[in-house]
């Protein structure tokens, strides 16, 4: 995340105005969540599942693989441990996923003015047909704040998704990369089925609203919370009743 943020900062030093040269760059159009003219935006959102897993995503597998989990179950109720593990993993994944976004925005504040985006400047591809385009041009702080919340919630989902496969994994690498592989596979299948509006990478990216055109924010948050409940139920209920399969 830090490397990506640094790359964005270097780019900002070289770009101080729009493509047409008639409107200055602003804090919302140069950071990693608000630009589309380099590949770093795509890199961040595709690597986000791995970033989210790094803090505690593999901790359940490691506790069980080392035998330490048995000692925990002796001292604490199994249900309490599983719920606490899920909550901690979810929160840590959300924070890890959102930090590059936040740091990039903060670094952007050092170089460019805090003015509202202008559609005629052609800094991005957000137009009046995209979701929340009125927020983007009139209330940009609110617009990117909502997307930060979406990013953190999705980061939590990716982190807890790694918990859901821990009981059947043979090594921690599979646990770490499973959310990434799942996201890539889902992206490919959704593209083939023409349902890109449900892909997490498109839902999280503030510059990809064209792919979720027609969806309300209520439906987006409903999808995210449904995924949270599904991961919670699968992880807690399954591990409450059985030990590792392999």
What kind of region is each of these model predictions?
Residues 6-7, 105-117, 171, 191, ...:
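Transmembrane helix-loop junctions in multipass membrane proteins, especially transporters and channels
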Residues 1-61, 86-159, 163, 205-226:
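Secretory targeting signals
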Residues 1, 76-78, 170-172:
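Short loop-to-helix capping motifs
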Residues 164, 225-246:
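Junction motif at the cytosolic side of a transmembrane helix
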Residues 172-186, 202-203:
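Central hydrophobic cores of alpha-helical transmembrane segments
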Residues 76-88:
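Amphipathic cytosolic juxtamembrane alpha-helices at the membrane-cytosol interface
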Residues 54-74, 78:
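Transmembrane helix boundary and interhelical loop/hinge segments in multi-pass membrane proteins
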Residues 89, 180-184, 228:
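Residue-level recognition of pore/gate-forming positions within transmembrane alpha-helices
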